[in-house]
C-alpha cells in the first residue's frame, strides 16, 4: 500500500496534467483512502475530484498524526499535547483551537505554553526576532519544566508561526520524540530536527517565502501542505474559502 506522501505526490502530478477538478476513483478501506485510479474498477469505486481526494488525504494524515501513539511507547500510557502559539496568534484562534479540540477528542491532555510579553513589530527585524525567540524559549522552559515526559505514551506539539521554532528547539534541546503539527512555520523552524512533523503553509504568507519553505521541508523530509493564496493565518480573505480551509487542514 502506498504511503500518504506517495499518494499525494501522485495526485499533485495528475493535477498538473489534468486539472484539480478531474474525476478519479478512490479505493477505501474503513473510510481510509488507500489508492486511486483513473477508471472505476472492483476496488476503486468512489468517484471524487483530484482536489477533493488531495484534501481528504491531508485530513487523514492529520488524524493519523493526532491519534497515534509514539512508536514503541506504552499504548495504555497517557497522551499529552502542548500548544505553542504565535506572537499574535493565540491558542483560542481557529487553527490552534480546533486542532486542540481534535487532539482532546483522541485522548490527549492539553497544555498551552504562555510566553508572557514579547517584543512587537518583529517582522523584518532579526534582532527583535532573536530577542522574541530567546524570551519565548525561556518562558517555555519554565512553563514545561515540571513535566515528566517519560510518563506519556504520545507527545504532540501543536504550533503556529514563531511557536513552530520554539517547539522544534525545545524538542531538540530535550531530545524528545514528538509528533509535531507546524502551522505556518518560519524558515528558522527548519534549523532543528523535524522527524514526525507535518507542516502547513499559505502561498501568500508574507513571513515565509513559499519556494524556500518547500525546499527546507523537503530537506527535512517533512510533509508540507500548501494552501493557495492563504496568508500567515492560513486565511484568504474570503469567508467561505476560509471556513473550507479550516475543515480540510
PLM region descriptions:
Residues 158-167:
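Gly/Ala-rich beta-loop-alpha elbow adjacent to hydrolase catalytic centers
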Amino acid at each position: 500500500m502506498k504511503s500518504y506522501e506517495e499518494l499525494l505526490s501522485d495526485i499533485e502530478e495528475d493535477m498538473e496534467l489534468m486539472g484539480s477538478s478531474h474525476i478519479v476513483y478512490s479505493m477505501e478501506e474503513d473510510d481510509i483512502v488507500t489508492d486511486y485510479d483513473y477508471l472505476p474498477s472492483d476496488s476503486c469505486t468512489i468517484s471524487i475530484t483530484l482536489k477533493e481526494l488531495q484534501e481528504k488525504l491531508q485530513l487523514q494524515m492529520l488524524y493519523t498524526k493526532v491519534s497515534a501513539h509514539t512508536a514503541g511507547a506504552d499504548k495504555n500510557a497517557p497522551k499529552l499535547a502542548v500548544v505553542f502559539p504565535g506572537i499574535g496568534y493565540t491558542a483560542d484562534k481557529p487553527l490552534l483551537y480546533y486542532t486542540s479540540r481534535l487532539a482532546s477528542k483522541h485522548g490527549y491532555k492539553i497544555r498551552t505554553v504562555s510566553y508572557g510579553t514579547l517584543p512587537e513589530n518583529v517582522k523584518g527585524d532579526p534582532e527583535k526576532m532573536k530577542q522574541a525567540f530567546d524570551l519565548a524559549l525561556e518562558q517555555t522552559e519554565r512553563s514545561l519544566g515540571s513535566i515528566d515526559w517519560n510518563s506519556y505514551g504520545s507527545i504532540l506539539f501543536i504550533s503556529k508561526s514563531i511557536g513552530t521554532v520554539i517547539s522544534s528547539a525545545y524538542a531538540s534541546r530535550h531530545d524528545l520524540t514528538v509528533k509535531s503539527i507546524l502551522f505556518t512555520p518560519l524558515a528558522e523552524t527548519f534549523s532543528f530536527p523535524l522527524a514526525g512533523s507535518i507542516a502547513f503553509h499559505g502561498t501568500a504568507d508574507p513571513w515565509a517565502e513559499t519556494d524556500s519553505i518547500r525546499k527546507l521541508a523537503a530537506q527535512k523530509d517533512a510533509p508540507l501542505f500548501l494552501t493557495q493564496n492563504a496568508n500567515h493565518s492560513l486565511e484568504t480573505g474570503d469567508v467561505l474559502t476560509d471556513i473550507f480551509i479550516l475543515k480540510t487542514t
